[in-house]
């Protein structure tokens, strides 16, 4: 089934921003649908925004609703392997996510991005470049606006960030172009292993006209024959060339702009810029109209963002680094004059933090480890200190700061042990940075 034909009873599992967008979308359908919402939280966010004709069951599951539904729409945070969904699956009830509903409804070109790291930056950058070329563009999915809310914008192009969780429940999304940026260990508390995680990511290519893959990460290549374009740091479809000692971003070995002109810093952002170029090229957007955006784009909040710079001490908010690979990328691009004071920790999601050791060894640093899994970092480097909270860590490091030092939050962990999300964690760090910068 692809659509609402024959559907009368719909159960939405999980409220919040995504769940509310699903409810609003269902209410807009011409079919007379009975909509019910299940949320295991006692007071789920958005409960007060539900219309009276949408019944809510909170504080647990409601099996009768699930097994009598014609269609179940789950929040990305709900795994299909959840035992509470098994009776409905055994009964043959279709379970989809919000992106599948988006696929049924969208009537303009869509491009999408997935990967373990960098997908938010690539999604936002691609959207900004398309807008600069005069294309009415809507950006969202796993970033910013929920995908279904974007449909109200009547865009000419949709640019979506898609997580592996969203892709699990997406089957019919047709894409003009799709990019799989990279694959590194993440969400091992959800998946049986890396192969399982990779298969979820690869679903982005199922109905893509052009598949954009990473030449430096063969795990991003589809297992079946597809139309491929690749990006990387060598020459290729989209890559880098050197002329007169200057590195350039290039398409088919033809230079587009110098790497040192990019508004974003760090080697990983050269790759991110190449992906954005490849995606827009795939949908026929004139690249000349987009290159100025690459020169001026400074990135997203909570991603290697300098939030304070006072007395020669920089405070960098990289709260979006919720896994080891993200923190490694942040460390690889650093320009340090003094010592790095690195804040790590939170919920490790079963990750192997030992991959950080070589990068830490090469840096002049002190590492402050906090949160639920902070103790797992201490053994990585003798220059480590265990703290209960980020506040305690900053209070401890502050008296030791000298001109040229950098304080960086790049936790390599999820935030939900002490914060609502990575944004709240980043905001808390930013507040601390500004507070201590004033005092210094």
Curated annotation (Swiss-Prot):
HAMAP family named among the record's database cross-references: MurD
Pathway where this protein functions: Cell wall biogenesis; peptidoglycan biosynthesis
Annotated positions binding ATP: 115-121
Catalytic activity: UDP-N-acetyl-alpha-D-muramoyl-L-alanine + D-glutamate + ATP = UDP-N-acetyl-alpha-D-muramoyl-L-alanyl-D-glutamate + ADP + phosphate + H(+)
Role of this protein: Cell wall formation. Catalyzes the addition of glutamate to the nucleotide precursor UDP-N-acetylmuramoyl-L-alanine (UMA).
Entry-linked Pfam families: Mur_ligase_C (PF02875), Mur_ligase_M (PF08245), MurD-like_N (PF21799)
Keyword ATP-binding in annotation: yes
UniProt name for this protein: UDP-N-acetylmuramoylalanine--D-glutamate ligase
Family: Belongs to the MurCDEF family.
GO MF assignments: ATP binding; UDP-N-acetylmuramoylalanine-D-glutamate ligase activity
Keywords of the record: ATP-binding, Cell cycle, Cell division, Cell shape, Cell wall biogenesis/degradation, Cytoplasm, Ligase, Nucleotide-binding, Peptidoglycan synthesis
S-S bonds: none
């Amino acid at each position: 089934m692809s659509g609402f034909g024959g559907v009368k009873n719909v159960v939405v599992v999980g409220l919040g921003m995504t769940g509310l967008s699903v409810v609003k979308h269902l209410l807009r359908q011409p079919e007379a649908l009975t909509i019910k919402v299940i949320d295991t939280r006692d007071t789920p966010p958005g409960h007060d925004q539900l219309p009276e004709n949408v019944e809510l069951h909170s504080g647990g599951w409601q099996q009768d609703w699930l097994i009598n539904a014609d269609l179940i729409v789950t929040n990305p945070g709900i795994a299909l392997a959840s035992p509470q969904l098994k009776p409905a699956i055994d009964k043959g009830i279709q379970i989809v996510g919000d992106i599948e509903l988006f696929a049924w409804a969208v009537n303009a070109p869509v491009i999408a991005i997935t990967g373990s790291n960098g997908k938010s930056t690539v999604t936002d950058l691609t959207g900004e470049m398309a807008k600069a070329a005069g294309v009415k563009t809507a950006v969202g999915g796993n970033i910013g606006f929920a995908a279904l809310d974007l449909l109200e914008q009547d865009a000419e192009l949709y640019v979506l960030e898609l997580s592996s969780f969203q892709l699990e429940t997406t089957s019919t999304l047709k894409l003009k172009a799709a990019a799989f940026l990279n694959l590194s260990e993440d969400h091992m508390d959800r998946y049986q292993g890396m192969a399982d995680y990779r298969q979820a990511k690869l679903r982005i290519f199922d109905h893509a006209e052009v598949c954009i893959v990473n030449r430096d990460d063969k795990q991003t290549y589809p297992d079946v024959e597809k139309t491929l374009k690749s990006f990387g740091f060598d020459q290729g479809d989209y890559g880098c060339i050197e002329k007169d000692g200057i590195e350039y971003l290039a398409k088919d070995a033809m230079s587009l702009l110098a790497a040192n002109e990019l508004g974003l810093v760090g080697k990983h952002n050269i790759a991110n810029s190449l992906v954005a170029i490849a995606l827009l090229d795939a949908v026929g957007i004139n690249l000349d109209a987009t290159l100025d955006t690459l020169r001026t784009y400074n990135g997203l909040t909570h991603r290697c963002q300098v939030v304070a710079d006072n007395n020669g001490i920089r405070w960098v908010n990289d709260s979006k680094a919720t896994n080891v690979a993200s923190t490694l990328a942040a460390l690889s691009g650093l320009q340090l004059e003094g010592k790095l004071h690195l804040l790590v920790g939170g919920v490790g999601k079963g990750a192997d933090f030992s991959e950080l050791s070589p990068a830490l060894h090469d840096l002049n640093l002190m590492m402050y480890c906090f949160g639920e899994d902070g103790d797992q970092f201490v053994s990585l480097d003798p220059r480590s200190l265990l703290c209960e909270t980020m506040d305690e860590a900053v209070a401890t490091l502050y008296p030791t700061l000298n001109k040229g030092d950098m304080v960086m939050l790049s936790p390599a962990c999820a935030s939900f042990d002490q914060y609502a999300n990575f944004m709240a964690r980043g905001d808390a760090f930013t507040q601390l940075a500004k507070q201590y910068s004033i005092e210094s």
